[in-house]
Every structure is written in structure tokens, then in C-alpha cells.
């Protein structure tokens, strides 16, 4: 029968420090596997030597989440090739290859488990890895684990076994293809090609190594019991194996979380996880002993420790020796008829956090072993490696061991109370009876749930005329059991406790007219435990606790007491879990909106003290919610809120949280924010500069008007005389105001960006034009550099001195400050950009328009174009459209206004000469 084959790593083409190929010899939740060197040459290869010559049936590869080889080739050989052993020239024989998923659909957050079915005989296996490319990795490949499943290549024994099985089937009249007796089903473990789920790679990679060895031993005992026809005991062992698989998964997650905490140097959390594992392991082993499932196991200490040894090297004398099995004892004489779950989980003091896993192991099935007295080589316990998973894959949350669906077999009575339980619950026993309390203390969750439902029914049926003392005793006993059930990790038990607590507060107390002291007693005894459950690792339990606390705070019986707000405004503890801190601040924000600050227990003082302290929390979500709380308080009490905050100055605004808070205040008040204020200030400054420049030019024009007028009159008289003498009809006269510009002087007095030509455009004049007036240019508000508007976005992202403070929005493709980028992307209010071939994108008005260079001029300079180009209005008012593209006379026409206002009269000849020039041009 195929089973797991042990192997050692003979050679590899290289590895990164801390990720040797020898890591592949270990299967455990915390292994890191092999990684090729960085910037390595491809292909990379690994050679494995199996413990014996065998027939390989199945190969399993667990790939890395992003260091993924595009193709893995497999080669097999009976002995080492020539380049490894010089005196043997045999080469590897190629089996084929497999392609691995590029993992883009999951965002490189999951690992692929690839299974390959082969049929090849040999002792050496070579794997060749080819290069891959994704956005996270371009020069490295990795393999987390590899599993080889096969059987010894002794064909004679195999054929004999097959013939013997066929002979037995023949005499029994049983065909494996059409079985009649399920006990003799050939598709079950008796098949020669059957592969046990316990040999699957997924089983070892997500199971605690100690628990995995216990599961394998229980599986052997289960098959032994089935052979002896002790079916009740086999059924009990099967249920224990199923429960232990969930226990092993949880312990494996705890181990990964502990290693991750050590990696982050969070030693308090690591110590907490270690203690949590020890308590949980001791609890599980105690239940196994209680049910007689650890009989035959070696003596254990708490926590249980199995000898975990690494695989021996091929040269070691112990390499080919089998590991002796643990001593076995007789099975239990009495058979248990209970078919319910064997292991019942108890609440722990500290809740575990969610762990990321890649795949849940399959349900354990029977896996027969040919050896009873000795474990084969490949079943040797594997050690827990000291390497930490540096890139744990993000996978969906693992479900808790208990399900909401009842797994009831034959109804079972709760076990008797222990001495400790009798002392602890003595008052509740006196009031409710030992049977009900025993059910609430039972190790079977169905009994615990039934006890709470029975108590619910009893309280509902209490008659109205009952004495007050009896009613109060019943209430206190019920609260005692509710407190215990609130800490239960089983969802249905937790729900039953919430249902019972709600009924007591809203129905039982009002019905029997008990006082506020009794309501206060219920709330004060339950609320601390409920708040603790809001930090639970299970998202479902966490949400249930949050919603119930919010609902309970709104009960009219509880709201008047103002108790719950006093718990929520307590400062966050520095060592509190992330979920607990997030839940507390979220619950405070919810209730603050529902209850307000008038007679609710919330005051401006206690809420603001809590929110300001939460601004310093290490978790971003907590700080973000604290900002939202402060803004909500400012809407209701602006003056009192400001008293708890530092002054609004440049020093305070260096903190991005306070900057966001004060800008939020400005929006609430309708005032411009800091950015809007700077923009308005720049606009006012530009308008003032524009007005000052116009006044200066007007004064210069007035002072130059007499000289220009006199020179113009003389020039026009000379031209009139010349035209009269040469050609009275004016056909050969060339117009003096449109001189032809030579090619070598075409760029003189011309702005190459907007196309305007002006005599004032000397070297200094052009600089002034670029700096203040050109419609195609703008000044960067961050580095004061003059850039083209069409390239402003690229400038902010790549050239600007403040480019590190900007990021590119994937939706609109514009540069956005990094502190505003998450909100900008989340709101999706920006206008989506189109490709450059389809449209241009204006960074001023954020609109898309026609593509091409000329379209930029139309958009930025046209009257119907960009509405956010602040230079447009000034330039258009100063220089009308016909002025662009003309010769030097265009600049003269611009100074005609001062001439009209001059005291020197305009000569009459000027008008006739102008008309004659017009006629000549025609």
C-alpha cells in the first residue's frame, strides 16, 4: 500500500541564508522551506535521495505564495549521476513537468498545493525549477514543502499480495468493483492502491506534530478494533480522531502566531501564546485520559511532550533502522456506546488571534499499517523547526472546532459535578438544583446549551406572586450561569446566554417589579465579560457581542442607569489586543450617535479624554475612528471640544491626525481649509500684481506719447510724399506695417509655447512672460518652477522637490498628496481619465478633451476651454485675439490708448494713409 516515503536532500544549486533545501525534510506548520539565492541563474535544481528504492505513486508540492516557478520538471534515477558520483555514469530519466498557477487572481495571498500522480521506480529524484515573473518577484523561486508517496519496489511481494487478495475475494464471492459488504469494501483501506489521508502533505503542514502522532496511533488502534469487531470502540476512536484534527489545527495556528510575535519582538504576546498552548494542550490530554484514549501511550508531563527527532542523514548508522513503536496495552474491556464528540473545548483565559492558513487538512480516514510492533521509517516524528514563516499567506478564517449545527447522537446525561464545581456553584445548586447546574458545567456543549434553555423556560414560567427573595435568588443564580456561558467558545451556547440575559433584563425584572438595583447587578456582572468577547479571535462571536452590547445599552431599563458608557470611555490598555481596542472605540462611536451627550453617561469631558488618548494608539483603524469621534463632538459642542485639543498652529499641524482634525473643523464651520486659503491668497496676489503692472504700463505710455506721436506724424508725411511721387495709384507700394520676417529671425520676439509675438519679448521680456502671463505655462505651488500645464502631473510625480509627497491615482491618473490619496481613491469621486490616444487630461480643471498638441492650445487659451486657468482672463483682457501672430505693429496698437488720451492732436493725414494702405493690401 502506498505510504509516505522519507528522504534526504543530497544537493541543491544554491539557497538563500536561512532557507536551506534541508528545510524540505521537515513537515510542520512553522516550516519556511527552500528559497533560491537572490539574482540567481535559472534553472535551479534540487536532488533528493529516498530511504529505499521505491515505486513513486504520488508527488505533492506546496508552492510559495509569490516566489512561484513557472514550471517544475521531475527526473528519476536508480543512482547518483556522474557529476555527483564520478564513478557512476547513469543519468536521470525525465518523468515530465507541471505548471504552477501564477497566483494573480488571489493577489499572491494563497499557496498552491499541487498533486502529481506518477508511476516510476528509483531512489533519487531531481526537481528543476524554471524562472517566473510577477509584480512581487522577478529573480527568486521557492518551495515550501514536498511530499513523496509510494511503496517499496519489491515487485515479487507485491504480486504475491495481489494474488492472495484476489484469491480471498474469489472464495468470498466478493468483487472490489461491486462490493456488497461495506466491511469488505475493496475501495476502502484494503485496496492495494489506497493512500491514507494521514500521509497527505496537508495533514502534516497544518497539524501540531505531537497531535499528529497521537492521531496516527489512534488510527492504528481504530483499525485494530475494527478487525476485532469492536465497532463501538472503533466509532469512539473515529470521533476522537476527527476532534483531534481540529485541535491539531488550532495548536498549529497558535505556534505560528507565537513565532510571528517573536519575530516582531512582541514577547508579551509570545508568552501569552505559549501559556495558551500549554493550557489548551493539557485540557485536551486530560479529556483524552478521561475517555481512556491515552492508554498505551508513554507517561506524559503537562504539557505533553513527544520525542521529536530530525531525519537522520544517509551516512548515519541509524538511517536504515526503524523506530520502535510505543508499548501497547490491552484495549478497554467495556465499550462506550456514546457517539457524541469526544473532546469538548473549554474557554481559555485569553482568546487566540486569527491565523492565516492555506488549506484545511482532509478528514482522517482509516489507514492500515502492515507493521504493528514497529513504526516504519517515514512515520518517525518530525521536529518543529525554528524558522518563522516570514510571509504567511493570507487565507480565509478557520472555523472554530464547534459548529452551530448540533451533532447529537444518543442523548447523553451530563457528568457529575466535581468537588471544585460543587464548592463554586453551591448557591446556584441550592436555587436551581444540581441537575441543571451539572448541565451548565458539562463538557458536552449540547448539555450546556440545554441547561440554559431549560433555565430560560423556568424563568418565563415563574408566577407573578412569587416572593421577592426567591425571585432575587433565582436572578442571581441565573446571572452566575450566564457569566460562565458568556465565556463559552461554542457559538450556540454563547447565543443562549445572550438570549437569557436579554429576557431577564427586559421581561423578568419588569414582570416581577424588581428594582433598579437588580438591573444594575445584571449589567455590572455581564458587561465586563461581554466587552472581553469583543476582542475574540472569531469574527462571528465578536460581531455578536458588539451588536448585543449596543442593543442592551438602548434598553429603556439600562439606558437610564448610564452604566455602559462609563465602561466604554475607559482609556485603552497598551497591552490590549487589536480586536479589543478596535471594538471598544467602534462601540463608543456607535453609542455616541445613538445616545448623545445629554443624560446618557457620555460627557464632552470623558469622551474627549478617551478620543485624544486613542489618537496615540498603534492601530490605524483606532486612530481613524478617534478622529471621527472628535469631529462628531465638535458638531455638537465646538467650544468645549477645542478645550481638549492643542492650539491650531504650524507645530500642531505637523501631526497629520491633528491636521485632518482641524481641516475637518473648518469644513464643518464652512471656513476654507489651509489648502483652500493658500489658493485664495495666491489668486489675490496675482490680481494685485496684474493691476500694478497695468498701472505701470499706463504711466509709461503717457510719458512716451508725445515723442511717439511726433515721430509717427513725420513718418506718415514722408511715406505719403514717397507714395505720391512713385505710384499715384499705389499698386507698387509695399505696406510698411507688415514687413516680411527673415527665416533666421523668425523666433525673435516669439513665445514658442502660446505663439504670441511682441516687441517687448526680449530675453528679459520673455522670462517675465513665462513667469506671469503665458497661458500654456504655470508655476508649481511646491517648488515655484515654471512648467507646462500639459506636463504638470508628470512634474509633480517625478521632478518636483516635493515629489515624495505625491502619489498617482489609478482612476484619474493625476498627482494627489499621499495623505489624501487613500480617501481620494476610496471615495471614487474623481473623473476617470482616458488613454492618451483618446483624450488629453487637464490637471487644472480635471476634464478630458480632444487629443493632440494643438488641442492643448484650444483648451487653455480659448474662451470656451479651461475654466481654472487663472492667467486666461488677464491675458485676454490685455491683448485681444487678433493681436497674436502679427508683426511689430501689433505691439504699437497696444499703446494706442495712451495716445488717444494725449493732448497732442492726431494728424489728419494719418487716417487717409491708413485707408490707402488698406486699399493697397486689397
UniProtKB/Swiss-Prot annotation:
Entry annotated with the keyword Repeat: yes
Quaternary data: Interacts with CCP110 and CEP97. Interacts with ARMC9, TOGARAM1, CCDC66 and CSPP1.
Extent of the HEAT repeats: 526-564, 601-637
Localization per Swiss-Prot or TrEMBL: Cell projection, Cilium; Cytoplasm, Cytoskeleton, Microtubule organizing center, Centrosome, Centriole; Cytoplasm, Cytoskeleton, Microtubule organizing center, Centrosome; Cytoplasm, Cytoskeleton, Spindle pole
Lineage, opening ranks: Eukaryota, Metazoa, Chordata, Craniata, Vertebrata
Xref: SUPFAM superfamilies: ARM repeat, Galactose-binding domain-like
Record keywords: Cell projection, Coiled coil, Cytoplasm, Cytoskeleton, Repeat
Coiled-coil ranges (or none): 210-277, 678-705
Protein name: Centrosomal protein of 104 kDa
UniProt cross-references to InterPro entries, sorted A to Z: ARM-like, ARM-type_fold, CEP104-like, CEP104_N, CEP104_Znf, Galactose-bd-like_sf, TOG, Znf_RING/FYVE/PHD
Region (Disordered): 307-333, 348-419, 673-741, 880-922
Tissue specificity: Expressed predominantly in the brain. Also detected, although at much lower levels, in the heart and the liver. Within the brain, expressed in the cerebral cortex, hippocampus, cerebellum and brainstem.
GO molecular function: glutamate binding; glycine binding; thienylcyclohexylpiperidine binding
Low complexity composition bias: residue spans: 307-318
Compositionally biased residues, Basic and acidic residues: 396-407, 673-697, 714-725
One Pfam family per UniProt: CEP104_N
Listed GO CC annotations: centriole; centrosome; cilium; cytoplasm; spindle pole
Species for this entry: Rattus norvegicus
Function: Required for ciliogenesis and for structural integrity at the ciliary tip.
Entry keyword Cytoplasm: yes
Amino acid at each position: 500500500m502506498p505510504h509516505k516515503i522519507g528522504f534526504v536532500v543530497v544537493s541543491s544549486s544554491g539557497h538563500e541564508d536561512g532557507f536551506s533545501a534541508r528545510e524540505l525534510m521537515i513537515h510542520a506548520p512553522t516550516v519556511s522551506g527552500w528559497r533560491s539565492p537572490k539574482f540567481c541563474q535559472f534553472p535551479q535544481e534540487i536532488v533528493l535521495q529516498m530511504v529505499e528504492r521505491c515505486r513513486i505513486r504520488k508527488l505533492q508540492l506546496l508552492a510559495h505564495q509569490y516566489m512561484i516557478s513557472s514550471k517544475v520538471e521531475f527526473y528519476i534515477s536508480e543512482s547518483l549521476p556522474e557529476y555527483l558520483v564520478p564513478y557512476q555514469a547513469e543519468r536521470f530519466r525525465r518523468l515530465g513537468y507541471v505548471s504552477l498557477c501564477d497566483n494573480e487572481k488571489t493577489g499572491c495571498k494563497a499557496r498552491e498545493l499541487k498533486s502529481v500522480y506518477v508511476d516510476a521506480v528509483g531512489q533519487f529524484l531531481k526537481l528543476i525549477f524554471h524562472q517566473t515573473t510577477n509584480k512581487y518577484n522577478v529573480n527568486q523561486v521557492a518551495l515550501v514543502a514536498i511530499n513523496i508517496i509510494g511503496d517499496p519496489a519489491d515487485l515479487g511481494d507485491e504480486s504475491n499480495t495481489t494474488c492472495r487478495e484476489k484469491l480471498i475475494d474469489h472464495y468470498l464471492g466478493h468483487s472490489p468493483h461491486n462490493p456488497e459488504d461495506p466491511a469488505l469494501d475493496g475501495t476502502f483501506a484494503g485496496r492495494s492502491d489506497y493512500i491514507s489521508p494521514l500521509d497527505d502533505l496537508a495533514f502534516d503542514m497544518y497539524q501540531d506534530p505531537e497531535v499528529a502522532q497521537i492521531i496516527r496511533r489512534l488510527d492504528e488502534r481504530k483499525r485494530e478494533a475494527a478487525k476485532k469487531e469492536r465497532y463501538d470502540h472503533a466509532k469512539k476512536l473515529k470521533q476522537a480522531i476527527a476532534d483531534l484534527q481540529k485541535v491539531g489545527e488550532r495548536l498549529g495556528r497558535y505556534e505560528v502566531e507565537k513565532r510571528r510575535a517573536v519575530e516582531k519582538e512582541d514577547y508579551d504576546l509570545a508568552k501569552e501564546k505559549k501559556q495558551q498552548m500549554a493550557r489548551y494542550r493539557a485540557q485536551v490530554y486530560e479529556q483524552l485520559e478521561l475517555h481512556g484514549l491515552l492508554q498505551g501511550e508513554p507517561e506524559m508531563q503537562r504539557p505533553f511532550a513527544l520525542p521529536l527527532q530530525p531525519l537522520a542523514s544517509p551516512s548515519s548508522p541509524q538511517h536504515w533502522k526503524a523506530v520502535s513503536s510505543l508499548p501497547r496495552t490491552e484495549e478497554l474491556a467495556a465499550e462506550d456506546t456514546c457517539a457524541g464528540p469526544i473532546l469538548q473545548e473549554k474557554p481559555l483565559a485569553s482568546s487566540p488571534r486569527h491565523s492565516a492558513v492555506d488549506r484545511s487538512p482532509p478528514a482522517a480516514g482509516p489507514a492500515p499499517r502492515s507493521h504493528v510492533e514497529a513504526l516504519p521509517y517515514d512515520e518517525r516524528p518530525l521536529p518543529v523547526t525554528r524558522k518563522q514563516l516570514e510571509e504567511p499567506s493570507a487565507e480565509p478564517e478557520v472555523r472554530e472546532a464547534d459548529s452551530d449545527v448540533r451533532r447529537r447522537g444518543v442523548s447523553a446525561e451530563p457528568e457529575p459535578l466535581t468537588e471544585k464545581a460543587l464548592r463554586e456553584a453551591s448557591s446556584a445548586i441550592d436555587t436551581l438544583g444540581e441537575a441543571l447546574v451539572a448541565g451548565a458545567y458539562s463538557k458536552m456543549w449540547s448539555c450546556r446549551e440545554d441547561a440554559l434553555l431549560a433555565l430560560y423556560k423556568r424563568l418565563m414560567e415563574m408566577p407573578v406572586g412569587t416572593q421577592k427573595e426567591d425571585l432575587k435568588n433565582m436572578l442571581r443564580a441565573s446571572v452566575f450561569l450566564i457569566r460562565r456561558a458568556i465565556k463559552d467558545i461554542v457559538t450556540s451556547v454563547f447565543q443562549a446566554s445572550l438570549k437569557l440575559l436579554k429576557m431577564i433584563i427586559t421581561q423578568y425584572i419588569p414582570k416581577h417589579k424588581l428594582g433598579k438595583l437588580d438591573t444594575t447587578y445584571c449589567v455590572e456582572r455581564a458587561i465586563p465579560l461581554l466587552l472581553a468577547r469583543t476582542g475574540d479571535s472569531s469574527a462571528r462571536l465578536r460581531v455578536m457581542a458588539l451588536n448585543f452590547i449596543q442593543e442592551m445599552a438602548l434598553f429603556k431599563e439600562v439606558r437610564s442607569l448610564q452604566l455602559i458608557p462609563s465602561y466604554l470611555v475607559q482609556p485603552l490598555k497598551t497591552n490590549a489586543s487589536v480586536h479589543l481596542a478596535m471594538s471598544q472605540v467602534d462601540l463608543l462611536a456607535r453609542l455616541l450617535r445613538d445616545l448623545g451627550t445629554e443624560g446618557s453617561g457620555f460627557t464632552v469631558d470623558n469622551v474627549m479624554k478617551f478620543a485624544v488618548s486613542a489618537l496615540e494608539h498603534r492601530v490605524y483603524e483606532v486612530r481613524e475612528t478617534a478622529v471621527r469621534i472628535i469631529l462628531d463632538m465638535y458638531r455638537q459642542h465646538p467650544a468645549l471640544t477645542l478645550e481638549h485639543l492643542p492650539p491650531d498652529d504650524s507645530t500642531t499641524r505637523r501631526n497629520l491626525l491633528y491636521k485632518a482634525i482641524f481641516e475637518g473643523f473648518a469644513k464643518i464651520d464652512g471656513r476654507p481649509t489651509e489648502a483652500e486659503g493658500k489658493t485664495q491668497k495666491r489668486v489675490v496676489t496675482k490680481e494685485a500684481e496684474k493691476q500694478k503692472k497695468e498701472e505701470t504700463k499706463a504711466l509709461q505710455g503717457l510719458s512716451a506719447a508725445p515723442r511717439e506721436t511726433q515721430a509717427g506724424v513725420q513718418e506718415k508725411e514722408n511715406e505719403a510724399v514717397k507714395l505720391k511721387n512713385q505710384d499715384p495709384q499705389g499698386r507698387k507700394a509695399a505696406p510698411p506695417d507688415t514687413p516680411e520676417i527673415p527665416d533666421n529671425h523668425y523666433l525673435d520676439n516669439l513665445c514658442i509655447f502660446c505663439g504670441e509675438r511682441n516687441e517687448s519679448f526680449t530675453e528679459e521680456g520673455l522670462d517675465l512672460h513665462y513667469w506671469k502671463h503665458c497661458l500654456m505655462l504655470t508655476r508649481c505651488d511646491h517648488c515655484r518652477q515654471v512648467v507646462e500645464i500639459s506636463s504638470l502631473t508628470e512634474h509633480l510625480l517625478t521632478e518636483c522637490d516635493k515629489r515624495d509627497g505625491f502619489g498617482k491615482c489609478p482612476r484619474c491618473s493625476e498627482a494627489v498628496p499621499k495623505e489624501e490619496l487613500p480617501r481620494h481613491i476610496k471615495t471614487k469621486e474623481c473623473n476617470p481619465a482616458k488613454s492618451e490616444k483618446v483624450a488629453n487630461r487637464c490637471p487644472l480643471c480635471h476634464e478630458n478633451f480632444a487629443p493632440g498638441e494643438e488641442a492643448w492650445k484650444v483648451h487653455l487659451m480659448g474662451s470656451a476651454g479651461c475654466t481654472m486657468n487663472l492667467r486666461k482672463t488677464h491675458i485676454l483682457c490685455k491683448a485681444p485675439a487678433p493681436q497674436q501672430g502679427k508683426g511689430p505693429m501689433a505691439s504699437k496698437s497696444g499703446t494706442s490708448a495712451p495716445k488717444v488720451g494725449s493732448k497732442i492732436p492726431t494728424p489728419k493725414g494719418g487716417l487717409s494713409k491708413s485707408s490707402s494702405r488698406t486699399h493697397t493690401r486689397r
